[in-house]
Amino acid sequence: MQRYKVTLMYDGTNFAGFQRQPNKRTVESTLTDVVNKMAKQPDPAIVIYGSGRTDAGVHALAQVVHFDFPFLIPADNMRKGLNSMLPMDMEVLKVEEVAPTFHARYDVSGKQYQYRMDMGEFRNPFKRNYTGHWKFPVDLAKINVALADLVGEHDYTSFVASGAQTRTFVRTIYEATCHIDEANHELVFEFYGNGFMYNQVRIMVGVLVEIGSGTRPVHDVLRLYEVKDRKQARRTVPAAGLYLKHVYYQGEDPQHPTKLPQHQR
C-alpha cells in the first residue's frame, strides 16, 4: 500500500460540503468514487481522509486529503489520472508520496482562510456564488483595529455556531488582515491560525463589517470574548465568499510549528 497526499481545489457551489452524506453530492464522496475506480474497485474500498470539513457552498483553493492506494503509481501520473476523471468543479493540483504515518487531519499545524465581500451598491448575480455582499460604506482603518483584537490565543465562544464538535473554544489566530481589491471592488479578509471552528470565520467577518460600518464599537471583539454569547455576534455572512486557502503541516512554517493540542480538538 502506498499513501498519497493530494492537494486539490474545488468550487463548492454545487457540493453539499466536503463530508460524505447520504444521497448528496459532496467533495469526499466524489473523490472517493474516482479513487476507487482508478484502483479497480478494491475490497475493502479506499477511504479518503481530509484535513477538515468545508460546508456547503464553501470553496477550496488548496484542500488536502490522503488515502492508501493498493499499488504504486508515480505521483504525477496519479494527479493526471484523477484529473481525467474528476468533474469540472474539482482539480487536483499536486500529488505526493508520503510516509504511512502521515495524516491529512491530525498532522495539520495551521490553516489559512480567505473571505471575499463584494461592496457593490447592488447585489451582483454573477458574484453570488463566490462572494458575500455588503453594500454599506466601511472604514478599513476601523476593521484593521478590530482585526488586531482577533489575533492571539482567545476563547472564541461568541464566534462559533451551535453544533460545533470541539472540546474547547480556545484557538490561536496568528495573522488576520483585510485589504480592498480595487479591481473587483471587494473586501478581502485573510485569517491564519492553528484551527477554526464551525462558522467561525464567517461570524468573525460579520462582526468586522459591522464594526467597519460603525454599527458596533471598534473594540467590540473584546466584549464578545467576555460575554461568550453567540447571539451577540449576530450575523453569519454567506458561505459563498469563503475559501480554504492553505493547509499547513508540521515543519512547513517554522514561525508557527505547533499543531493544535489534542485537548483543543
Swiss-Prot record:
<dbReference type="GO" id="GO:0160147">
    <property type="term" value="F:tRNA pseudouridine(38-40) synthase activity"/>
</dbReference>
<comment type="function">
    <text>Formation of pseudouridine at positions 38, 39 and 40 in the anticodon stem and loop of transfer RNAs.</text>
</comment>
<feature type="binding site">
    <location>
        <position position="113"/>
    </location>
    <ligand>
        <name>substrate</name>
    </ligand>
</feature>
<dbReference type="InterPro" id="IPR020094">
    <property type="entry name" value="TruA/RsuA/RluB/E/F_N"/>
</dbReference>
<keyword id="KW-0819">tRNA processing</keyword>
<dbReference type="InterPro" id="IPR020095">
    <property type="entry name" value="PsdUridine_synth_TruA_C"/>
</dbReference>
<dbReference type="InterPro" id="IPR020097">
    <property type="entry name" value="PsdUridine_synth_TruA_a/b_dom"/>
</dbReference>
<comment type="subunit">
    <text>Homodimer.</text>
</comment>
<dbReference type="InterPro" id="IPR020103">
    <property type="entry name" value="PsdUridine_synth_cat_dom_sf"/>
</dbReference>
<dbReference type="GO" id="GO:0031119">
    <property type="term" value="P:tRNA pseudouridine synthesis"/>
</dbReference>
<dbReference type="InterPro" id="IPR001406">
    <property type="entry name" value="PsdUridine_synth_TruA"/>
</dbReference>
<keyword id="KW-0413">Isomerase</keyword>
<dbReference type="Pfam" id="PF01416">
    <property type="entry name" value="PseudoU_synth_1"/>
</dbReference>
<comment type="similarity">
    <text>Belongs to the tRNA pseudouridine synthase TruA family.</text>
</comment>
<dbReference type="GO" id="GO:0003723">
    <property type="term" value="F:RNA binding"/>
</dbReference>
<protein>
    <recommendedName>
        <fullName>tRNA pseudouridine synthase A</fullName>
        <ecNumber>5.4.99.12</ecNumber>
    </recommendedName>
</protein>
<feature type="active site" description="Nucleophile">
    <location>
        <position position="55"/>
    </location>
</feature>
